[in-house]
Amino acid sequence: MNRREMIKMTGTAAVGATVLGIPVASSAQENGNNNASGKRRLKVLAIGAHPDDPETCCGGTMCLLADAGHDVVCVYLTRGEAGIPGKSHSEAAAIRVVESENACKVTGARHIFMSQVDGNTEVNLARYKEMRELIDRENPDIVMTHWPLDGHRDHACCGILVMDAWRRLDRRFKLFYFEAMSGTQSQMFHPTHWVNIESVLERKHEACNCHVSQHMEDVYLWHATMEHFRGLECRCQAAEAFAQHSDALPTLP
């Protein structure tokens, strides 16, 4: 649902039709290169800085797209090496990789881990190349990633790397940014699209709770507040919001 559709809407937002412009159906099953509705099976990348970022920020959308028969890939920039107090980087990474694998089983996504280090992410020529080559190899139709204006440096680095890849790959995929703890981490986030996640909310929570080391019972309160607020914006109980990156100049209706 985009901003214009939201403004025109007179009833409760319904799951179905499209998600970020992609056809979805609640009972779709994979069928070769097509989904159950007969539409072309698309590839969607959700690129997060840490294990748990894609799940908390766009986990509901991933579930909806995977259920519709689309190829959903969870890409983690780091292995969350600095994310467990008292554990070494290697110990924490081993734990968080398993948690991420379990979460992907819930959302229906496959996973890819990149080579950056939690808390020490970089934006340089080598890292630009690494991200660009991964996205080029996967050849997605849509990429979802962090809003680059973020108080968490790892989030900001991730968004910047993906944005650069989008430009250098001739904008051949649609790029959507998601929010993370808006106001605390994501700053000045201005959504263009909303996704009603009521039907998969419990499953999103299950995926997030796979990240046991992150104490989701406390952390998720921020995300639950965002889900509720974005739901109020589009007249449903829970939603995820996205900002589409487009170089097109705005035009009158």
What are these model-predicted stretches?
Residues K87-E91, V117, P191-W194:
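Short glycine-enriched, charge-decorated loop/helix-capping segments at active-site entrances
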Residues R3-G16, G21-I47, R110, E122-P253:
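Metal-dependent de-N-acetylase/amidase catalytic core
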Residues G80-K87, N120, T184-M188:
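A short acidic, helix-capping loop that chelates divalent metal ions and anchors anionic groups
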